[in-house]
Amino acid sequence: MGKQLRNQRHRALMAAVASTRIRAGLTQRDLAARLGRAHSFVGKVESGERQLNVLEFCELADALKVSATVLLSKVLRG
């Protein structure tokens, strides 16, 4: 398997993160600041270059001020 996972659910995750961030009025830099990470982290997550573990997913949801359950439901709906 290559460096970038490009299955349907991973693409749905990338889209859910980006759309939720944009709907919240945040830039990638804003979200990265909330996470205490470099802005490239958010860009890599949204582009599919970086996968998230479950704890990072929960931290991301918290930073977006949505529940992890809501964010996950967006991913599962595709």
Mark where each language-model region is.
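A short, Lys/Arg-rich alpha-helix, primarily the initiator
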Residues: M1-R23
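Short basic helix-loop element that most often maps to the first helix and adjoining turn
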Residues: A15-R34, E59
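Conserved hydrophobic/aromatic packing and binding residues within compact polymer-binding modules
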Residues: V17, L31-A32, V42-V45, L71
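Helix-turn-helix/winged-helix DNA-binding modules
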Residues: R23, E49-L52, A63
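Recognition helix of helix-turn-helix/homeodomain-like DNA-binding domains
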Residues: L35-L52
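DNA major-groove recognition helix of helix-turn-helix/homeodomain DNA-binding modules
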Residues: L55-V70
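Short amphipathic recognition helices of helix-turn-helix/homeodomain-type DNA-binding modules
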Residues: V70-G78
